[in-house]
Each structure stands twice: as structure tokens, then as C-alpha cells.
Amino acid sequence: MNGKRILLIDDDPDYVYAVKMILEKANYSVRVSYSPKEGYAALQDGEFDLVIVDVMMGRGAEGIIVARKLKKDRELKKLPLLMITGIREQTGFFFIGDPRHETFLPVDGFLEKPVNTEVLLNKVRELLHSDQTAELKQEKQGEEP
Amino acid sequence: MSDRYTILIIDDEEVVRDSCSQILAKGNFRIHTAADGDSGLKMTEEFRPDLVFVDLKMPGLSGLQVLERINRFDPTIVTIVITGYATIDSAVDAMKRGAYDFLPKPFSADEFRLITRRAVEKRKLLLDAITLRHEKEVIRENFTSIVSHELKSPLLAVQQNLYVILDGMVGELNPTQKEMMERVKNRVDSLLRLINTWTDMTSIDVSELKKRFKPVDIPALVSKAVEVFQAQAAAKNVTLVTDCARSVEPVNGDEGTLLEVFMNIMGNAIKFSERDSSISIKIEGGDGELHVSVSDKGVGIQKEDIPFIFDDFYRGKVQASGAEMGSGLGLAISKRIINAHDGSITVESEPGKGSTFTVVLPRETGKSRTHGKEKVAEQFAIWRSD
């Protein structure tokens, strides 16, 4: 174990099976929630270093609601959030460039399904790393005054 | 839908208001009357009548002005002009301002009933058209999202699991197993691409696209597309040569979809190019227009294929050697996008020698449409209020 904990929120068990496998082979500890509701519960009773969320769940683009909710939460917004989606047209016309938008789609990373193994692991490493540097910066800032 | 229609009668003569109300009293209508244009307009805004009878000659706002404002407020409201000085000119004037019919004074009760019945029919048709259009739109949207989600989800799950297997994360594959898995992965890939292209195509709403128009730097867009394909071209040792006129003014359009068009054309050019050849891309400004042409020295297009290459799902007889079969949608989508820009996309080709695709875009889209502005407004009027 490299000690990093990832929460995966996606309602497709077969898709989750593969992504969980990739992450676990890379020594991450993975917890899966099959709905936004389960995801919120998991965030309440567990500690995580990264959240990966799918866009299309349940009756529509519920993943976007999850992203907005997390980024509004004082504590949870510090968690890096990676969005994975198979639905291009829901997030931006033709999906050219980076669809992130600080209010519409407040996520830290965005990948399109199916995700290449290396691409996924690189993105996860990058987000976990930027989280650490952000923490370091905050600590430093805290020390200065 | 309730079949009780609301009718408003705007006339300064009390006799006319009363007799009209009386004639229709037995019918299943809600009847309101107004003595002048101002109060008539106020009532129109308040309860959106189905039919409005307007007297042409009234003190204050004239009947024609009232007509015009009702039409602007809600073009689906059916208006009928009542007038004492019936001339062809005044009738034509009223029609131009959106009146549906014309009732010369004095009129008989039967005449009035008949014209009311006709107007109610018209109103019903207009409302039905709106409902139908709306339903069609909902079906189209739902269908697209069902296709996206229900068709893609299983394929995405399959593909993600294949990646895990192919990357040897659940044990090494022997060469035969690996080969078979690669084949499976490629087939799933092209199926996913087909679904993506198809949903892209159905999600292009031309009127939505126009709302996003802004000045686009075409040479910059073209070089973006060139950049995307650089690696693919290099793999076949194909050189991409861009030749751009010095000062090219921006074109009014939608950057995202125009990029899609240029990428489509360039992707095709590379796909059908011979190894070690070159593709020339020319950008020229013309008379209020911009031309972008992409010429390859590839296999070319058979003469009998040319009339159909912009049709949905059409694939030419000659396919690129070694390349994957296309979906037959790329050019169809490109044509749709270019049409939305009031431009044109054409091809010239000689089998065995190569093809040239030319996109012509007007500097300012919309100019050509202003001629038929009234006609367009008429067509829009039917569904503008929904």
C-alpha cells in the first residue's frame, strides 16, 4: 500500500471493476460507492486523498451535482476531484479543449472513458501530488505570520 | 386541451362590441371587449386571447398599430381586422402586419360566425404545430441521450476491462491471446467512435449554433487542425504545407464546430494520401468570402461517388489502404456545420491523382438571409413562443 485512499463514485459495476483493478494494482486503496448518496455517506465516515466521480449516474448528470456539492463544502473542497465521463455532449460541445469551468464544472481533472491505464495513473499521481504541494504551501503560509 | 377559446373584440363603437358579443354568446367562447387600442393591448398581454378582432379606424392607437403590437407580442394570436372602409389597399396593409382575415362593415351574423370559425381553426392549427414541434424536439433529445448512455455505457465497461487485460494486469497474455484481444479492442473502439460521431451529428442544432457565433481567426484554427494531425501525417511521411494570404479577416462563426470541419477534411486527406506525398492547404480571402482548400495527392474519388459523399453514412468505393473504415458521417456533419454558417463545401477530384476540398465561408453570416427576413420571421413565428 502506498497509503493513498481513493473514493470511486460510479454506478456501473462492470466499469468500476476495471478501474478499481487498475488503481489497486498501483497500490492505492480504493473504496467504491455506486451512487452519489453512497458517496456522500462514504465521505462522512471515511478519509480520502482523492475522489473520482462519473458524470452520468441515476437519472442524469448527477456527477456534476456531486462535483458542485463537494466544491462548496469547506472541508471537502480541499480533496482533489477527478471526473471521468463517457458522455461528451453533456459537458461541452464536441469536447474540444478542457471542459473544466470553475462554477459549471468545478473539478480538478477530467478524463474521457475508456481511460488508458497510464493516462489514468498519471492523472491520479498528478492530482495527489498537487494536493500535497497545496498542503505544504498552506502549512508554510500558516507558519509565516 | 380545453376547447374554449378566448376572443377579444377591440372596437370604439359600442354597437359593434355588443352585437359581436351577442352573436358569439351561444358558442363556447370567453368573450372580452375593449373600446380602444391601449386597453385592448393591455388585455391581450393580461390573458393572451386566442383571437382578436381589431377595428382599423379608432381614436388613439390605430388598428394597424394594434395589429403590429399584438403580432410582436405573440405571433400565434390570430387577428382579424374589422373595417368600414374596405379597400384592397387597407386589406393588404393589414395582412402585411400579420392579420389573418378581413371583415368589412357592415357584416351579417352569419358572416361573423363563419369568419370566427375559420379563425379558431387557424389558431388550433398553430397551437398543434407548436405542440408537435416541441414533442419532436423532446423525442430527438431523449433519443440522443438514450443512445449516448445506454449504448455507450456497456461498451465503455467492456473497453475498460479489455485495457486491464491487455496491459497484463491480470496475468501475461500469450501472443495469440494478445492478438485476439487487440482485435476485440479495435472493433469496440470503432463502434464507440461511430456512436460518438452519430450523437455529435444529432446534437447539432443549427439555431443554437448561430447563437454562439463570434469572430473566428480561421488561419489560427487551420493551424490548430494541422497540429493535431502532424504526428499522423509524419507516420506516412506526408508533408502538410500551409499557404495563407497575408491579411485574412476573421469570419463570424462557431470555433468549435469549424475546427471539427477542418479536422475532418484534413483527417480524410491524410487517410487517403499516398505515402511520401504532400497535402497543400490554402487560405485565401475573396469578395466578402474566405476560401480554405485542402488538396491531397491521394487515391481520389470515383466520379459516381462524388454526388453522394456529403450524404449520411455514404462511403466511397475506394477505401484508404490500411486505414480503418470510416463511419460515412464525417463529411455529412461537416456539410451541416458549413451550411449553418451560410457557407459551402465542395470537392474536385480525379481518381488516382487526388482530391481538393474547398470550404467557402461568408465574412458575415446572416447577410444573405436578410433578403428573406420577413419570410424567415414568418416561419419562426410559429414556434417562437414555445
Which residue ranges define each predicted feature?
Chain A
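Short acidic/polar segment at the start of the alpha1 helix of CheY-like receiver
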Residues: 12-18, 117
